[in-house]
Amino acid sequence: MAHKKGTGSTRNGRDSNSKRLGVKAYGGEKVTAGSILIRQRGTSFLPGINVGKGKDDTLFALKEGTVSFESIKRNLRNRKRVNIVI
């Protein structure tokens, strides 16, 4: 007979790597063309003037300039739009 109870196994103990999402260039910051402005899942931020959207919804600068954010009201949900002011 065993004098110690055997240890059981657990179904926990895993975690995914962080995806480093979020704003990479804030309002008033100067950026160059091609700079990543926001990494996101879905469209929390919408692309505005001189801003492009990648296939993974990443927003990036199309031209050199200064980052500006604006709030827009759309379908009872406040959204934010990101622009590059030249």
From Swiss-Prot:
Highest taxon listed in the record's lineage: Bacteria
Record region (Disordered): 1-24
An example Gene Ontology biological process: translation
One of the Pfam families matching this protein, by short name: Ribosomal_L27
Keyword Manganese: no
Entry keywords, A to Z: Ribonucleoprotein, Ribosomal protein
GO CC entries: cytosolic large ribosomal subunit
Coiled coil: none
Gene3D superfamilies documented for this protein: 2.40.50.100
GO MF term list: structural constituent of ribosome
Family annotation (NCBIfam families): L27 (TIGR00062)
HAMAP family (UniProt xref): Ribosomal_bL27
Family: Belongs to the bacterial ribosomal protein bL27 family.
The name this protein goes by in its record: Large ribosomal subunit protein bL27
